[in-house]
Design a protein with these regions (language model features):
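Membrane-embedded alpha-helical bundles of multi-pass transporters/translocases
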Residues: 1-336
Length: 336
């Protein structure tokens, strides 16, 4: 089972998601269209995740509710995913054609060197890594509901309010992207996130205020969640313009890498901080230090990570250069 899980998640999933995400940059060179594609990706991802979550138990019960039923459930979802990916393959087209120089096979070492010369790639990978580290702290929700709020059942509400506002906020991203740059909406989103987290930090035991804070935080997450992968497409354009090497595969695979590593590091930090706080898993009560550790993971650390992300995005000034880059690349491809 472990081997199957590793092959499925680390192998098949990664091999699928890298080109899937890269298509945001290869299907169009228009920055606004890339934002709209990323919005669709984010919304469909949330709807799909919620749909799968809601359907799991009914499907398992339909197949008998035993151990074998879980296998049939996984096979069913796998089959549906395969069909949808084949439909995507059949109906998608890569419209961003590389110049003759850029399309030549480039050694991996030279590719990596070109990436490191792309300051916007470095900024975005650090931004995504820290964002996913913060997201990886979400496992603290059950601890917070039990030990800070005194009601484990409230974890369901916390979970819903951690994700639903993101989906709602994503709906408005196409309008915002048509009026503002990706940097601007990402910065605004970061500030909104900090406001939500500050509310939670100031009222750590007031469930009403926590719900308000979670809603505000979720609305703030939406711009960055939508814009990040669209920005990677712009980063690929900049890389080709600056170095003559277009490395969409490596650029977007690094985004997937940041997602996996960040989530793992977030989980690791969660365990380490709980341990340092003296959390006792089977204890009837927890020490003041352990309760502080839970609050820190739920609000204080995400607040710090959000501040770092805002600082990183302040150095991202690629949006204003995109018109010039687009014209130069268009001319190069025509003449290449």
């Amino acid at each position: 089972a472990f081997v199957t899980y590793v092959i499925a998640l680390a192998g098949v999933y990664t091999a699928t998601m890298v080109p899937y995400n890269a298509m945001i940059g290869t299907t169009t060179s228009n920055p606004v269209d890339r934002g709209n594609l990323s919005t669709s990706r984010t919304l469909a991802g949330f709807v799909g995740a919620m749909g799968v979550t809601a359907a799991v138990l009914p499907i398992v019960n339909f197949f008998g509710g035993d151990k074998q039923a879980w296998t049939w459930m996984a096979a069913l979802f796998g089959g549906i995913s395969t069909v949808l990916l084949l439909i995507l393959f059949k109906n998608s087209k890569e419209r961003v054609i590389e110049s003759a120089v850029a399309v030549e096979k480039v050694p991996l070492k030279k590719n990596l060197k070109a990436l490191l010369q792309n300051k916007y790639w470095v900024i975005m990978i650090l931004y995504m890594l820290i964002s996913f580290i913060s997201s990886g702290l979400g496992g603290i929700n059950i601890f917070y509901a039990q030990w800070i709020l005194g009601d484990p059942a409230k974890v369901a509400v916390i979970g819903i309010l951690s994700f639903m506002p993101i989906a709602v906020g994503a709906v408005f991203m196409p309008v915002l992207l048509s009026k503002f740059s990706k940097k601007t909406i990402t910065l605004i989103g970061g500030i909104v996130m900090m406001i939500g987290l500050l509310i939670i930090a100031v009222f750590p035991e007031n469930f009403t205020m926590i719900m308000v804070g979670l809603i505000i935080r979720g609305l703030g997450i939406a711009p960055g969640a939508v814009a990040a992968f669209a920005m990677l497409g712009d980063v690929a354009d900049y890389g080709e313009w600056k170095t003559g090497i277009r490395s969409e595969g490596l650029i977007f695979s690094a985004g997937t890498f940041a997602e996996k590593v960040g989530s793992g590091v977030g989980g690791l930090i969660l365990g380490v901080v709980l341990g340092l706080g003296g959390y006792v898993s089977q204890g009837a009560t927890q020490s003041t230090e352990a309760l502080f550790a839970i609050k820190a993971i739920f609000a204080y650390l995400p607040l710090a990570f959000t501040a770092i992300c805002i600082l990183l995005i302040l150095f991202y000034d690629l949006d204003k250069k995109l018109p010039e880059i687009a014209e130069d690349l268009k001319a190069k491809r025509v003449n290449g």
